[in-house]
Design a protein with these regions (language model features):
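Structural detector for internal amphipathic alpha-helices that build alpha-solenoid repeat scaffolds
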Residues: 2-13, 33-47, 66-85, 103-118, ...
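Amphipathic alpha-helical scaffolding segments comprising HEAT/armadillo-like alpha-solenoid repeats
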Residues: 11-26, 47-63, 84-98, 118-133, ...
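Detector for Asparagine
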Residues: 27, 61-64, 96, 106, ...
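Charged, low-complexity interaction regions
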Residues: 29-31
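Terminal, low-structured helical/coil segments at or just beyond the last alpha-helical repeat
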Residues: 225-251
Length: 251
């Protein structure tokens, strides 16, 4: 057997070993100690394929929620520790993994929160949101997680990206987008889009949230041609002043 044959066989053996460990790790019916051993062994392997195998654990839920949380925490800690290896691009592998996922991204995002700085996380969330449309999705979990995380990442670039989701067909996404935009508080950017959303919105909690924001910003005036529409949707505790601003009625 030549050297190249030996190296090829060694590489194939490693691939088979990682596949076997991944199969154990993602089998929710084996004993927890077996899955823990698989996590430890994959961590020690320290290869890109081992990182991908560990990420697969985030895709399944163990029947016991305590065990499930403990194992996912262990995987999270293992991935963070593996990132210390300068020859192992844990960040890049997880980022590519997230690009192809439509659900269960919370734990991989949690790992990246430890590995990326603030601006890098903003750029990542912006990139991932760009691939999310505002149309109907059977499972909007990824979009919802990203919009939710956006609230804690104040950035005009991210606020601009979030504006699309004011028109999302999913009410929860619209509500979270409003919350995030108000938390970012780029007033000149959000005033007109929020006013338009207020005119069209049917969800009471979203109308309430936007009306509260307008009442807190009396400099946000409603154009005369839009006042009739706005008055028609305002909850009873709000009113529209003749000067065009929304205010809260006194009890």
């Amino acid at each position: 057997m030549g050297l190249l044959d030996f190296l090829f066989d060694k590489e194939q053996a490693q691939v088979r070993r990682i596949q076997k460990l991944k199969k154990t790790l993602t089998n929710m019916y084996v004993q927890p100690p077996e899955r823990k051993y698989a996590i430890q062994t994959l961590r020690d392997e320290g290869t890109p394929d081992a990182v991908r195998a560990l990420l697969a654990r985030f895709e399944d839920n163990a029947p016991n929620t305590t065990v499930d949380g403990d194992e996912k925490t262990y995987v999270y800690e293992s991935l963070v520790s593996m990132s210390a290896d300068p020859d192992l691009d844990v960040r890049g592998i997880i980022t590519n993994y997230l690009r192809g996922r439509e659900e269960k991204i919370n734990w991989p995002m949690k790992v990246l929160t430890d590995l990326l700085d603030y601006q890098e996380m903003i750029s990542l969330v912006c990139e991932l949101l760009e691939s999310c449309g505002a149309d109907y999705q059977r499972n909007p979990e990824k979009k919802q997680e990203l919009v939710l995380r956006s609230a804690d990442l104040r950035s005009e670039e991210l606020s601009t990206e979030l504006l699309r989701f004011l028109d999302d067909l999913n009410e929860t996404i619209r509500f979270l987008a409003v919350e995030a935009l108000l938390k970012h508080d780029f007033k000149d950017l959000i005033e007109a889009p929020l006013r338009e959303r207020l005119r069209e919105e049917e969800s009471l909690r979203i109308v309430q949230k936007i009306a509260d924001a307008f009442a807190a910003n009396p400099e946000w005036k409603i154009p005369e041609e839009e006042r009739e529409d706005i008055e028609a949707v305002l909850p009873n505790e709000f009113a529209l002043h003749t000067e065009g601003y929304i205010y809260q009625r006194h009890a």
